[in-house]
């Protein structure tokens, strides 16, 4: 039996940009040659791509870290480093990608061959050619490559199906799917034979078709995680029409009406919008003795429980075993699909902003100041830390440039206003220097 995995937590780390070079021309007949250090190449991004051949997230169970390659360093004679190739990670169709820390949805991958940059590679550092000015025609300044984005992502897989079969275990969902579609699910005379969603293509009439999914049996408390409830309910979210399968036989000793109410309560508790989907009641196993009598009792209870303005739900009498009553059910299902639009899982406007953005967000202030336990001062913040990482401290001019940029950010003024004294230690990441007032 193949395992099914519909959630995974992974780390994606894009490649660092290549360092820029400090170099000078050393050519015959060219005295006092100018700067010749090239730029570093860009780091490789991590890109998710939909693969229709994948049906689970099992590949991410043991392979949880994906790293892009770094760009090459800049070279002499103004030659730029080669950019790294992007890392393509294949995911199944229907995968939702979320930021693990915030829970924000980054993208919903539902289109064939759809791609999305989940971690952008760092840009290459500039070589000293870029820093030449009339006042300083031969600078010994170059940048280190920009670090690539590093994220923890949560992947959730929801099967892509138009119609979902819901109901308690052993009510005949798998049998029904097997006789109306090309699916061949495992069928057994015991509960939870189906532990993964089965999908089949259903042909109706001339040319009409739709995808039907047999959802594993639900139990009371599924919305709060009882059994494997949340995993199963997640897959129903993409469907447009629900077929609620009820067992009208006496084999399991169940009450069809209580089953009907319990399953709908679970759907509503998990996600209110699931109850907005058209739902057909499928009275299954009508070939069994006493089935007609039990169906009549079900209809009486259902009618008595309806509000004054509620219409009686549509009920179809079928037998998956003898294949009776199925054509009418499928025809009505096809009609409802034609009338029912897709239900959006996420707000398109909010999702659009996330999809369009690949870079680093600007903070209101480029740095923050805090105190260490020993009384030293610590600078932090994405902007100033990135500036620090991209500074090449092997060259004095680069160090002086970094100091000027710190002053331009207002670091000196802020430290002074917070009480920093001459000789106090100031730290940024693992680097330490003395404050000079």
From Swiss-Prot:
Its main location: cytoplasm. Gene3D superfamilies: GTP-binding protein OBG, C-terminal domain (3.30.300.350), GTP1/OBG domain (2.70.210.12), P-loop containing nucleotide triphosphate hydrolases (3.40.50.300). GTP binds at residues 167-174, 192-196, 214-217, 284-287, 319-321. One of its GO terms (biological process) is ribosome biogenesis. Mg(2+) binds at residues 174, 194. Residues 161-338 form the OBG-type G domain. Residues 2-160 form the Obg domain. Keywords: Cytoplasm, GTP-binding, Hydrolase, Magnesium, Metal-binding, Nucleotide-binding. Its cofactor is Mg(2+). It is an enzyme of class 3 (hydrolase). One of its GO terms (cellular component) is cytoplasm. GO terms for molecular function: GTP binding; GTPase activity; magnesium ion binding. Residues 359-437 form the OCT domain. PROSITE patterns: G_OBG (PS51710), GTP1_OBG (PS00905), OBG (PS51883), OCT (PS51881). InterPro entries: G_OBG (IPR031167), GTP-bd (IPR006073), GTP-bd_Obg/CgtA (IPR014100), GTP-bd_prot_GTP1/OBG_C_sf (IPR036346), GTP1-OBG_CS (IPR006074), GTP1_OBG_dom (IPR006169), GTP1_OBG_dom_sf (IPR036726), OBG_GTPase (IPR045086). Signal peptide: none annotated. It holds the Pfam family DUF1967. It is found in: Cytoplasm. Its EC number is 3.6.5.-. Monomer. Belongs to the TRAFAC class OBG-HflX-like GTPase superfamily. OBG GTPase family. An essential GTPase which binds GTP, GDP and possibly (p)ppGpp with moderate affinity, with high nucleotide exchange rates and a fairly low GTP hydrolysis rate. Plays a role in control of the cell cycle, stress response, ribosome biogenesis and in those bacteria that undergo differentiation, in morphogenesis control. This is GTPase Obg. It comes from Lactococcus lactis subsp. cremoris (strain MG1363). The gene is obg.
């Amino acid at each position: 039996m193949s395992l099914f995995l519909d959630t995974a937590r992974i780390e994606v780390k894009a490649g660092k940009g290549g360092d820029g070079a400090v170099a000078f021309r050393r050519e015959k007949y060219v005295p006092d040659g100018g700067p010749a250090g090239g730029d570093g190449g860009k780091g490789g991004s991590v890109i998710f791509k939909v693969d229709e051949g994948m049906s689970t997230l099992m590949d991410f169970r043991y392979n949880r870290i994906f790293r892009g390659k770094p760009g090459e360093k800049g070279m002499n004679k103004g030659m730029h480093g080669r950019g790294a190739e992007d890392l393509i990670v294949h995911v199944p169709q229907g995968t939702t990608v979320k930021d693990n820390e915030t829970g924000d949805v980054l993208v919903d991958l539902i289109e064939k061959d759809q791609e999305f940059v989940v971690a952008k590679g760092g840009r290459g550092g500039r070589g000293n050619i870029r820093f030449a000015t009339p006042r300083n025609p031969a600078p010994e300044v170059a940048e280190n490559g920009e670090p690539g984005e590093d994220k923890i992502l949560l992947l959730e897989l929801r099967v892509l199906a138009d119609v979902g079969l819901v109901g308690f275990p052993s009510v005949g969902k798998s049998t029904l799917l097997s006789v109306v579609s090309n699916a061949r699910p495992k069928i057994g005379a015991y509960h939870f034979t189906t532990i993964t969603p089965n999908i089949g293509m259903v042909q109706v009439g001339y040319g009409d078709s739709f995808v039907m999914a047999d959802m594993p049996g639900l139990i009371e408390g599924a919305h709060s995680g009882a059994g494997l409830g949340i995993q199963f309910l997640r897959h129903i979210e993409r469907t447009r029409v629900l077929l609620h399968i009820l067992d009208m036989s006496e084999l399991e000793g169940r009450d069809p009406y209580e089953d009907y109410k319990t399953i709908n309560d679970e759907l509503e508790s998990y996600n209110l919008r699931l109850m907005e989907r058209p739902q057909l009641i499928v009275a299954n196993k009508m070939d069994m003795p006493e089935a007609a009598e039990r169906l009549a009792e079900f209809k009486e209870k259902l009618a008595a429980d309806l509000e004054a303005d509620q219409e009686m739900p549509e009920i179809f009498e079928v037998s998956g075993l003898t294949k009776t009553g199925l054509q009418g059910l499928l025809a009505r299902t096809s009609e409802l699909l034609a009338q029912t639009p897709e239900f959006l899982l996420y707000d398109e406007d909010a999702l659009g902003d996330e999809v369009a953005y690949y870079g680093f967000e600007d903070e209101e202030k480029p740095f923050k100041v805090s105190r260490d336990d020993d009384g030293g001062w610590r600078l932090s913040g994405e902007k100033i830390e990135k500036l620090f990482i991209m500074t090449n401290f092997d060259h004095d001019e680069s160090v002086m440039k970094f100091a000027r940029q710190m002053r331009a950010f207002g670091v000196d003024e802020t430290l002074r206003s917070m009480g920093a004294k001459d000789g106090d230690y100031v730290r940024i990441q693992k680097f330490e220097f003395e404050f000079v007032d």
